[in-house]
Amino acid sequence: MQRNNGEGRPEGMHRISRFLHGNPFKNNASPQDDSTTRTEVYEEGGVEDSAVDYDNASGNAAPRLTAAPNTHAQQANLQSGNTSITHETQSTSRGQEATTSPSLSASHEKPARPQTGEGSDNEDEDEDIDALIEDLYSQDQEEEQVEEEESPGPAGAAKVVPEELLETDPKYGLTESEVEERKKKYGLNQMKEEKTNNIKKFLSFFVGPIQFVMELAAALAAGLRDWVDFGVICALLLLNATVGFVQEYQAGSIVDELKKTMALKASVLRDGRVKEIEASEIVPGDILHLDEGTICPADGRLITKDCFLQVDQSAITGESLAVDKHQNDTMYSSSTVKRGEAFMVVTATADSTFVGRAASLVGAAGQSQGHFTEVLNGIGTILLVLVILTLLCIYTAAFYRSVRLAALLEYTLAITIIGVPVGLPAVVTTTMAVGAAYLAKKKAIVQKLSAIESLAGVEILCSDKTGTLTKNRLSLGEPYCVEGVSPDDLMLTACLASSRKKKGLDAIDKAFLKALRNYPKAKDQLSKYKVLDFHPFDPVSKKITAYVEAPDGQRITCVKGAPLWVFKTVQDDHEVPEAITDAYREQVNDMASRGFRSLGVARKADGKQWEILGIMPCSDPPRHDTARTIHEAIGLGLRIKMLTGDAVGIAKETARQLGMGTNVYNAERLGLSGGGDMPGSEVNDFVEAADGFAEVFPQHKYAVVDILQQRGYLVAMTGDGVNDAPSLKKADAGIAVEGASDAARSAADIVFLAPGLSAIIDALKTSRQIFHRMYAYVVYRIALSLHLEIFLGLWLIIRNQLLNLELIVFIAIFADVATLAIAYDNAPYAMKPVKWNLPRLWGLATIVGILLAIGTWIVNTTMIAQGQNRGIVQNFGVQDEVLFLQISLTENWLIFITRCSGPFWSSFPSWQLSGAVLVVDILATLFCIFGWFKGGHQTSIVAVIRIWMYSFGIFCLIAGVYYILSESSSFDRWMHGKHKERGTTRKLEDFVMQLQRTSTHHEAEGKVTS
């Protein structure tokens, strides 16, 4: 049950309103602030009963409107006056079924939507239901032909609409001239989207420490007229920029396609006639006609006297909590009318709507640089500093040797190329892009590549329940039948008390009709009954009532609804035996404690007493793969916390069925609304230890994410509504689930197109594989840079010699071209969350780089040894060619060491990586043998074989050292790479919580005073 504070809004909602810059309208502060919100309609006996609050606290039952014989009369009933409005085209009768009462709402969470991945059974069930309803619903159906008018005009910026412009004549509407004037002032009803400058976006990939060094190297190469080096460096820069730009552009295009779900048409009253126009043509002050199935195209205020609508606001809130709307209540853009009919005056369009303001807020927040980008920039900066230090040493030595300027520039270019991994951005971006493409095949759209790294390190997943953990599809359980009543009788009566109108069918009625396949006798009898009158759910009596005629002509009244209220109907008619009463109440309490939503069923034949038939439990069952997926997630070191709008009992029962922890609490205990007496540190402990929270509002989700992040966790958050956008933005990995609203998709890092938790866990495992590839490459590439920087720096300082500049460039090219294929490597996924442990990474890379430099130095020094058979390749090779081959082989093979979690033979590389390295090794060998470069000389095949053997020996030595260091806890401690225990500054947490409560208290007082 929603509790209201002094402002008439759900308690605690003032916090989320801060996220959305306050209330843009006069009436309701947010979609969840409507005073007629219903919760847990059917739950009694241990679970909260329904509470329906009216603005005027009249306590009267909702008005029931019977169908008008024609559209003119219908409009006359709907409008505040009795003057009829001329329709452009006469419509047929709407039938006898009333359409203004709310449906049976059973959940706080989002409404049922088509489930993918559940097999074809669900689709067959839907087709069966449609066929059944078509058969049952034999009344006249409405056919309206409307005229389409288009009046394009300039789109201006959205502005605040003066109240006098909203005083449109409800019987006539706006004139065409008034519409044109308002179009010029307020523009079209289209949300303004930030147009990305693709040129600026592309150029942004040329910015960064590593990119700056590459650009400096290209300038040096051009100055030295070394066009080969210049072309290679520019090609690497373009490769990196192109891959990154194309990937993000493709992700954005996919998301743009998902946004094409807005209302396209609208029925508007203009010049005294109701006509259908493009939704973009709506202007403030327009009178819109809303009926079942209408997607509200703008914000507005209901003006029909005594109107009563049931509105689905799941596109905004992400929850299917039924909302009842009355005269003067606010309708929000993108909400859907489920039942009822009314007229409204448009108060805001485009960016001035509630959804528009929320989207603007999310867009204004901007995108952070991303942790992975920071890591790469940090690595590039450190390597750049090392390059500068090395060059200072070389310049000092050159000063004493009077080295000419041209030679110094060559030294600078050489050290710059080998000291900073020019291909690092390209390889890493390619690796993530390939991973993102793979994730897209699994229905996970990565909106920014850095989200892959964030997802790999997630330790806690805050997941909603409906549609992610459960099917979001109500199903019926085993019924309880009063003695002497058969299940088929109970089912038949319950289905007779269900809507037969397909357009307004709610989840409860749909569940009953689906279940008919298990009750063949009831299904056969259902079509033989004639519905004389039908009254949808009454929020006061908490029942649905149907008056039917049996095949024998007998008239029967059928009801279903809240169990105790249905039972009270029978008790008011006659005394029920104590045994039946006790058994009935016991079943109600038992079902409520187990989290079922239960419905009582009763009937009364003419001239007879009311007869209680029994109780039908219904629930949203877990998805078939959820329990297994949760068990798998626990094995992956991932904790899952359930955040749901459902009642605590339902949440606990779902958690029990799924094998999750059952420490699920009411979100009010967080004390976010100014109440609560737990110190801040205890609240944080409470959140950290809890397995989930029930009856949550969006601000609770935001607070849970914030608290967990303060405790040092990487947190992922799932969401689907506009109000979830701040939480998705706050989380380290924001996940928009299948069916999410546009605002949620925009705020999320990853958009899932498939339902269920398994899709998220699959993406998490894939992200860890991608992270493993990136980590292996970064260690490899840093080691290579240090290898050549140490060797060439010492060689220049000690002997004033340098490897052929072309060979240095080819070494850099070969290293990066070969390892581009690491994006397709057979990488394992870690069994626990992975993070960048930079001290350990630098420690491993430095030791490996030193060992590589020592190996190359040994080859270099023995080549100048004097005497017979004293050197490794003495008398069989030329220095530059032999060094080029030895450096190329040992560096290329190093990737086979860093890519493995264990010994290098424990995991076989992919054929793409093996093939790329083999091709590069063959090219390096041919370069060495035939001297394919400027000033090159041929090398003996004997020298080549010896270098291959020597390089393999170096490879085995480094592999052993790398494995020992990787498995050594002492090395971890020595490098200070182990993450510290999460220390909690408890006094600070207490102070912050007290400050929040004081602020909330004063804010509430100020609003009450005003």
Swiss-Prot record:
Which cellular components does GO assign to this protein?
cell division site; cell tip; plasma membrane
The region called Disordered is annotated at 1-126, 139-165
Where do transmembrane segments lie in this chain?
A: 202-222, 227-246, 378-399, 411-433, 806-824, 841-860, 913-933, 947-963
Q: Name one GO molecular function term.
A: ATP binding
Where in or outside the cell it occurs: the entry states: Cell membrane
Q: What is this protein called?
A: Plasma membrane ATPase 2
One Pfam assignment: Hydrolase
Instruction: Give a short account of its post-translational modification.
Output: In addition to transient phosphorylation of the active site Asp residue, this protein, but not the product of the pma1 locus, is phosphorylated efficiently in isolated plasma membrane.
The UniProt entry, under InterPro entries, shows: ATPase_P-typ_cation-transptr_N, ATPase_P-typ_cyto_dom_N, ATPase_P-typ_P_site, ATPase_P-typ_TM_dom_sf, ATPase_P-typ_transduc_dom_A_sf, HAD-like_sf, HAD_sf, P-type_ATPase_IIIA
Catalytic activity line of the entry: ATP + H2O + H(+)(in) = ADP + phosphate + 2 H(+)(out)
Role summary? The plasma membrane ATPase of plants and fungi is a hydrogen ion pump. The proton gradient it generates drives the active transport of nutrients by H(+)-symport. The resulting external acidification and/or internal alkinization may mediate growth responses.
- Gene giving rise to this polypeptide: pma2
Per the record, the GO terms for biological process are:
proton export across plasma membrane; proton transmembrane transport; regulation of intracellular pH
The chain's Extracellular topological domains, given as residue ranges, are 223-226, 400-410, 825-840, 934-946
* Membrane topology label: Multi-pass membrane protein
**PANTHER family tied to this protein:** CALCIUM-TRANSPORTING ATPASE
UniProt keyword Mitochondrion, yes or no? no
**EC number(s) stated in the UniProt entry for this protein:** 7.1.2.1
Polar residues compositional bias: what residue ranges? 25-34, 68-106
- Protein keywords: ATP-binding, Cell membrane, Hydrogen ion transport, Ion transport, Magnesium, Membrane, Metal-binding, Nucleotide-binding, Phosphoprotein, Translocase, Transmembrane, Transmembrane helix, Transport
Q: What spans are recorded as compositionally biased (Acidic residues)?
A: 42-52, 140-151
* Source organism of the structure: Schizosaccharomyces pombe (strain 972 / ATCC 24843) (Fission yeast)
Keyword Phosphoprotein listed? The answer is yes
Stretches with biased composition (Basic and acidic residues): 1-14
User: Membrane side Cytoplasmic: which residues?
Assistant: 1-201, 247-377, 434-805, 861-912, 964-1010
